[in-house]
A protein has these predicted regions:
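A structural/positional concept
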Residues: 1-36
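A detector for short metal-coordination/catalytic motifs
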Residues: 45, 49, 56-203
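Beta-strand elements of modular eukaryotic interaction domains
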Residues: 17-18, 40-41, 91-92
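Conserved, ordered domain cores of eukaryotic regulatory proteins
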Residues: 26-60
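Short, charged, low-hydrophobicity "junction" segments
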Residues: 1-5, 38-40, 75-79
Length: 203
């Protein structure tokens, strides 16, 4: 089952560019710089291919707020209710900067597969500091690039910060919760089954 994790250039190219600029054209976890940008002043800075990716990798058919998956997301992840209500419909949240984060390749692949996650360090997380968690089948070749203290701070590099807000702590918290559940299932459960009523009632 294919996840639509990276915004396509057809309908998400503008938001992809805006979010990468918001994140300073660096991977927010590794601080690796975008190889497509002009050479950084700091010549010691590593470069790689970056992508602005969805925090919650929606399937195209699940982008309707009436879908069973979204009914269960609202029910079993209460904090998501306000996030969905604020954007009125799932599609409004899908192409929203709050649902997009900049990561390097191949880290964004692990993020999309829920093999790495960012947990808020406080209830309101106004400081946007997150604890990095790795999960089952994480690509261990990436370990040298991860922050030694296990913390990731998100910073908005835009002058007009309201135009492109930072990723939502609620969405990152939900992503982390799903990653933990998938980790506990030994990788034997896919996201569709995870978000089914029958499965969630057993958790």
């Amino acid at each position: 089952m294919k996840m639509a994790n990276r915004p396509s250039h057809g309908d998400g190219g503008d938001i992809e560019k805006a979010c990468m600029q918001r994140d300073g054209n660096i991977c927010v976890v590794t601080q690796v710089y975008d190889v497509h940008q002009p050479a950084p002043d700091d010549k010691s800075m590593l470069t790689s291919y970056l992508a602005a990716v969805h925090i919650l990798p929606f399937l195209e058919e699940e982008r309707s707020a009436s879908s069973g998956v979204w009914f269960n997301v609202r029910r079993y992840f209460p904090s998501m209710r306000s996030e969905l209500d604020d954007h009125h419909q799932v599609d409004g949240l899908y192409h929203n900067p709050r649902n997009v984060i900049t990561l390097m390749d191949p880290l964004y692949r692990d993020f999309g597969d829920f093999r790495v996650s960012l947990e808020p360090t406080s209830n309101n997380n106004a400081s946007h500091v997150y604890r990095l968690r790795t999960h089952r089948n994480f690509s261990t070749c990436l370990v040298p690039f991860l922050p030694e203290n296990g913390l990731v701070t998100l910073t908005n590099h835009n002058n007009e910060k309201d135009e492109c807000p930072l990723p939502s702590p609620v969405l990152l918290e939900t992503h982390a919760a799903i990653a933990q559940i998938l980790d506990a299932t030994d990788g034997s459960t896919d996201i569709r089954r995870l978000l089914s009523v029958k499965f969630l009632r057993r958790r």
